[in-house]
Every structure is written in structure tokens, then in C-alpha cells.
Amino acid sequence: MVLPASRNGSVRTWPSDRDLLNSIHQFEIEVTAKDVDRNGHVNNVVYIQWMQDAAVAHALASGCTKTSEAVGATWVVRTHQIEYLSPLFAGDKVTVLTWPANFQRVRSVRKYQFVRAKDGVVVARAETDWVFVNAKTGRPQSIPEEVRNTLPVVTKDLEP
């Protein structure tokens, strides 16, 4: 797994717990010319699309999508928050790390780190607040245990 460089330059270690490692999904991207705006770097809206793509890929890979559909539900975005730390440019390769940070009754926070491949620098951090809703009515509904179990939570002390 690609891990960002630590802030103080120390060696990063990672737990060997299989569930934890499976909870952090990696989504690889190569920045294209169409991702770049007039300022010459990746446009802020592109990060949101990458967040959506990474979350969907993780939900599909973990079985969350299938399990949610089986109970007649889906996920919708409530809010996004992004902190931009360093720009990305056409040709850059970036790994989006994403994981569930918590589950509440009808909501879940998913976190993201954007790590530039060539130097391991975290170029952005983000969060999405997702709401679990009934697919027919669009109304929030409680997240059942079988859905929660598809995506084990990564606690703050174990985040990359």
C-alpha cells in the first residue's frame, strides 16, 4: 500500500490487521490535460469527481453496493470538505486513499488522502458526509449491521 511520507520524516509503519488494510481503498489516477484549469493545475471540481469515483470503487469492491441494494437503499452525498495542500499538474500520478471514518445512525463520514506518486506527498485531504437513504423514497434510513460490516471503520489513530 502506498503511504504518504510522515510530516517529520520518520519511517511510517502500518498495522498488519487484514480488516484494516481492506478498509483503506486505493484508487490510482493519472492527471490528464482535461483535468487542468486555466491556472495550469488540477481544477478543484476534478477532486470531487475523483472522490466520487474512489468511493464508488471502494463500495463496489467491498460488497457495500450490493448489500445496500439488497436492503433497498443507496448512499447520497450531504457535504464535501477539501483541504488543498499542493497542486497537481498534467502527467502527475496520484493515489487516492479512502476509508470510512465512522458510522452514525443514517450517516457515515468517508475520508480521503491524495498522495502524489513521485514523492509520497499528500497534496489534498478531504471528507464526504454520506447519508444512507431508501432507494424508492429518498428518505434517510438506519444503516443496517450487514451494510456496516462491509466497510470496517478506520479510527483516527490508525489513519494513514
PLM region descriptions:
Residues V2-T95, A101-P160:
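Terminal targeting signals and extreme-terminal segments of soluble enzymes
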